[in-house]
Curated annotation (Swiss-Prot):
The C-terminal peroxisomal targeting signal (PTS) is essential for the efficient targeting and import of AOX into peroxisomes via the PTS1 pathway. A motif (Microbody targeting signal) lies at residues 661-663. This is Alcohol oxidase 1. It catalyses: a primary alcohol + O2 = an aldehyde + H2O2. Keywords: FAD, Flavoprotein, Methanol utilization, Oxidoreductase, Peroxisome. Homooctamer. Assembles only after import into the peroxisomal matrix, fails to assemble in the cytoplasm. One of its GO terms (molecular function) is alcohol oxidase activity. GO terms for biological process: methane catabolic process; methanol metabolic process. Pathway: Energy metabolism; methane degradation. Coiled coil: none annotated. Belongs to the GMC oxidoreductase family. GO terms for cellular component: peroxisomal matrix. Its cofactor is FAD.
Length: 663
């Protein structure tokens, strides 16, 4: 199908939100020509995308489906530069993310303080997106006919129930539906963006774009094409200038112009959307001139208010009789063949899950809060106290070591994955040149507000005690835990001799061989627990007592290991143009997602969020996509059933079902 040079609607960026926007609008009216421009490659039936269990491959530094942005050095990270990966493939984060189904809290969207963005306004759109593929006690808040599927996947590692029982012993109750928009403290068997019927990842592009293109001819897909700038004519966004995703000839840059008759929607993501606006002349005039760009519209908020969820991992050894995904990820050929064959036979087995089987959302008890520093206590009173639906931290259990398996000994592991739900820290991103290939001036602001440290330290301690109450537990991976003083009772401990021998087998001559006191083995459990029915342990390791030096070791570990959770947002915030308490540098968009100072231009991605959301952000990205598509439809004069914009169901072709299209 030939690509025209003019469209009715142009959607710039085919990520989680952009794919939704383009697919919906192409089904608003099949006489509308909709163009979707994406910098990455097409994800159609790419096994690195649709096979859930191999998602870690997309995070590798040589990934073809992600780009990596390096920040300025930060004293808050002990001088490190943060590395923030962003999807570089059609479908965006939905093609490569962890597939964790997590909703924000009701107060999150109310806190946007924008007309039409309250949770009561957005709930119908949340339901419209999803097909909830499990028994449901809350049918009023979930959807059952949407294009995106939600399930437990088609496999569950045994670490799931062990974690849930251990969490309960920590005062974290099991909850049937932790994504009910109101519960902020509990544990659950975690749902996933996986289609139960096929065992495939449920990404935005297959659900909205490919399904539409197989049934209608009014949606045009332009991949491997980077948005350079938006062209404004007589106060209206009229066209977009693009370049190849990678420079073909730096001395002779290649440009192409696409025009839009009715609407342009910018959806390049939290990092790239503000850069496109800045190259187009929207932003802080001083910064624009310094970068060699003529200011067009004075919007200092463009590129400010950068937010993320701060993440760190804590891996543990597990006993050899338990199952993990380590041998599969490590490259055991026999195991990989068995796992792949099972998935291609019936869509089940370890490839049909992400291995993140259970997790918690938590708020501190009054006693726990009193033990945190005064700065966080004050922040808690201001931000959390009157919003009981907001969790402070999340952590979940991963059924294996999440990281580079060439850097650790063979064996079986589990990993605690933590992230701070509502950081107080803020960052920024700005262009340094009109060149679309130039690296930006990027300060994500990780940990630059002292109030963010206390809950991170608390979560490490909390998750560590959860791990120590699990029957899987066989010691810490000491190289990936804080460097506590040698004499500290909190010191991380390796596997005990019995477990080492079980791994080594009768012919192993070195299991348990220690070099002096370099490492210390785990001691046998000694503490009795009367609550063993729910905790899964009759005998427990005693609670660790941490002193001030131990806390400093944890803080140092967090500064050296905190990273992005791939949940960045906020750089093109909705809010008053003159600014507000939550958008201090001034809003970029009005409540209908229109860019101030120009007609015909909206932004529709996570960058529009003025404040954070307590969830894995694919849920919010889809919601923003649905909301933006509805706003565009209304602006074009459509109403009623037309705004349903129902997309066709994506169906596999015969060749695709056979599994012959493998790697």
């Amino acid at each position: 199908m030939a690509i025209p040079e003019e469209f009715d609607i142009l959607v710039l960026g085919g990520g989680s939100s952009g794919s939704c926007i383009a697919g919906r609008l192409a089904n608003l009216d099949h006489s509308l020509k909709v163009g979707l421009i994406e910098a990455g490659e097409n994800n159609l039936n790419n096994p690195w995308v649709y096979l859930p269990g191999i998602y870690p491959r997309n995070m590798k530094l040589d990934s073809k489906t992600a780009s990596f942005y390096t920040s300025n050095p930060s004293p808050h990270l002990n001088g490190r530069r943060a590395i923030v990966p962003c999807a570089n493939v059609l479908g965006g984060g939905s093609s490569i993310n962890f597939m964790m189904y997590t909703r924000g809290s009701a107060s999150d969207y109310d806190d946007f303080q924008a007309e039409g963005w309250k949770t009561k306004d957005l709930l119908p759109l949340m339901k419209k997106t999803e097909t909830y593929q499990r028994a449901c006690n809350n049918p009023d808040i979930h959807g059952f006919e949407g294009p995106i599927k939600v399930s437990f996947g088609n496999y569950t590692y045994p670490v799931c129930q062990d974690f849930l029982r251990a969490s309960e012993s920590q005062g974290i109750p099991y909850v049937d539906d932790l994504e009910d928009l109101v519960t902020a403290h509990g544990a659950e068997h975690w749902l996933k963006w996986i289609n139960r019927d096929t065992g495939r990842r449920s990404d935005s592009a297959h659900a909205f774009v490919h399904s539409t293109m197989r049934n209608h001819d009014n949606l045009y897909l332009i991949c491997n094409t980077k948005v350079d700038k938006i062209i404004v004519e007589d106060g209206r966004a009229a066209a977009v200038r693009t370049v190849p995703s990678k420079p073909l000839n730096p001395k002779k840059p290649s440009h192409k112009i696409y025009r839009a008759r009715k609407q342009i929607v910018l959806s390049c993501g939290t990092i790239s959307s503000p850069l496109v606006l800045q190259r187009s002349g929207f932003g802080d005039p001083i910064k624009l001139r310094a970068a060699g760009v003529k200011p067009l519209v004075n919007l200092p908020g463009v590129g400010r208010n950068f937010q993320d969820h701060y993440c760190f991992f804590s891996p543990y050894r597990i006993k050899p009789q338990y199952e993990s995904f380590d041998d599969f990820v490590r490259g055991d050929a026999e195991i990989q063949k068995r796992v792949f064959d099972q998935w291609y036979a019936n869509g089940t087995g370890p490839l049909a899950t992400n291995g993140i089987e259970a997790g918690v959302k938590i708020r501190p008890t009054p006693e726990e809060l009193s033990q945190m520093d005064e700065s966080f206590q004050e922040g808690y009173r201001e931000y959390f106290e009157d919003k009981p639906d907001k969790p402070v931290m999340h952590y979940s259990i991963i059924a294996g070591f999440f990281g580079d398996h060439t850097k650790i000994p063979p064996g079986k592991y589990m990993t605690m994955f933590h992230f701070l739900e509502y950081p107080f820290s803020r960052g920024s991103i700005h262009i340094t040149s009109p060149d679309p290939y130039a690296a930006p001036d990027f300060d994500p602001g990780f940990m630059n507000d002292e109030r963010d440290m206390a809950p991170m330290v608390w979560a490490y301690k909390k998750s560590r005690e959860t791990a120590r109450r699990m029957d899987h537990f066989a010691g810490e991976v000491t190289s990936h835990h804080p460097l506590f003083p040698y004499s500290s009772e909190a010191r991380a401990l390796e596997m005990d001799l019995e477990t080492s021998n079980a791994y080594g087998g009768p012919l192993n001559l070195s299991a348990g061989l220690a070099h002096g006191s370099w490492t210390q083995p785990l001691k046998k459990p000694t503490a009795k627990n009367e609550g063993h029915v729910t905790s899964n342990q009759v005998e427990l390791h005693p609670d660790i007592e941490y002193d001030e030096e131990d806390d400093k070791a944890i803080e140092n570990y967090i500064r050296e290991h905190t990273e992005t959770t791939w949940h960045c947002l906020g750089t093109c915030s909705i809010g008053p143009r003159e600014g507000s308490k939550i958008v201090k540098w001034g809003g970029v968009l009005d409540h209908r997602s229109n860019v101030y100072g120009v007609k015909g231009l909206k932004v529709g991605d996570l960058s529009v969020c003025p404040d954070n959301v307590g969830c894995n952000t694919y849920t919010t990205a889809l919601l923003i996509g649905e909301k933006t598509a509805t706003l565009v439809g209304e602006d074009l004069g459509y109403s009623g059933e037309a705004l349903d914009m129902t997309v066709p169901q994506f169906k596999l072709g015969t060749y695709e079902k056979t599994g012959l299209a493998r790697f």
